[in-house]
Amino acid sequence: MPIVRAKPTSPGRRFVEKVVHPHLYKGRPFAALLESKSKTGGRNNNGRITTRHIGGGHKQHYRIIDFKRTKDNIPATVERIEYDPNRTAHIALLKYADGERRYIIAAKKQAVGDTVMSGELSPIRPGNCLPLKNIPLGTVIHNIELKIGKGAQMARAAGASVQLLGRDGIYAILRLRSGETRRVHVNCRAVIGEVSNTENNLKSLGKAGASRWRGIRPSVRGVAMNPVDHPHGGGEGRNKGRHPTSPWGQKSKGLKTRNNKRTDSMIIRRRAKKK
């Protein structure tokens, strides 16, 4: 898709770079697959901030996405490709042969009129969903289940993909974009192809207000705070005086915080370190 740079008619327009998607549907979303969505402001049920930098933003409806893809051996036609404010990927509205409609994450190069199927006998085409045991080695996939029947959990963001490297007994071996290699059960399902909207990382919001529309509040540096607010706060000038930490004293910039021994055995090779 073309990338458009706005004319600098104002300071807020000067740095805007947009990815134009002329193929996206311009009408309202399918009402039967919408749910109301309330803002939390990053607070829990006690009213305390549990996630910083969240608040405000435009009102949104949640689109109910079919991550399980369990409607097997019934062909569906892509009615339209839509924008979804809840995720970076685009979504596709499917109309099945029996008349039912469902939203799915749109695959790259998926277009209106394409036929989509789920199940073990589905052809190897972008957007089709199969168990990992039925997918040829070397295939690029997305929307991958980690538990059988739970629904897709991995590789769901715009442009995301995973490569199926091989099979070892009851496990398939996958290589993630991060460089990590891990095992997933061969009966878990995955969708063929990459996720749509691959140029999402090339856009530039251009101004702070565009982040506020998305419900993202400003991030304040720790060294700009007082000692009561952050371990980096206070002092003369801008000295931290210690290893970089979070506001709660947890070391950042390289400290490993993963604590999930239950699935450690599923990871064959950890992701590569940043240089």
From Swiss-Prot:
GO BP annotation list: cytoplasmic translation
Gene Ontology CC entries for this record: large ribosomal subunit
One function term, GO molecular function aspect: structural constituent of ribosome
Keywords for this protein: Ribonucleoprotein, Ribosomal protein, RNA-binding, rRNA-binding
Tagged with keyword Ribosomal protein: yes
Pfam entry (one): Ribosomal_L2_C
Stored InterPro entries: NA-bd_OB-fold, Rib_uL2_dom2, Ribosomal_uL2, Ribosomal_uL2_bac/org-type, Ribosomal_uL2_C, Ribosomal_uL2_CS, Ribosomal_uL2_dom3, Ribosomal_uL2_RNA-bd_dom
UniProt superkingdom: Bacteria
Biased composition (Basic and acidic residues): 229-239
Annotated stretches, region: Disordered: 222-275
Signal peptide: none
NCBIfam families: rplB_bact
Function per UniProt: One of the primary rRNA binding proteins. Required for association of the 30S and 50S subunits to form the 70S ribosome, for tRNA binding and peptide bond formation. It has been suggested to have peptidyltransferase activity; this is somewhat controversial. Makes several contacts with the 16S rRNA in the 70S ribosome.
Quaternary structure (record): Part of the 50S ribosomal subunit. Forms a bridge to the 30S subunit in the 70S ribosome.
Family: Belongs to the universal ribosomal protein uL2 family.
Protein name: Large ribosomal subunit protein uL2
Organism placement in taxonomy: Bacteria, Pseudomonadati, Pseudomonadota, Gammaproteobacteria, Moraxellales
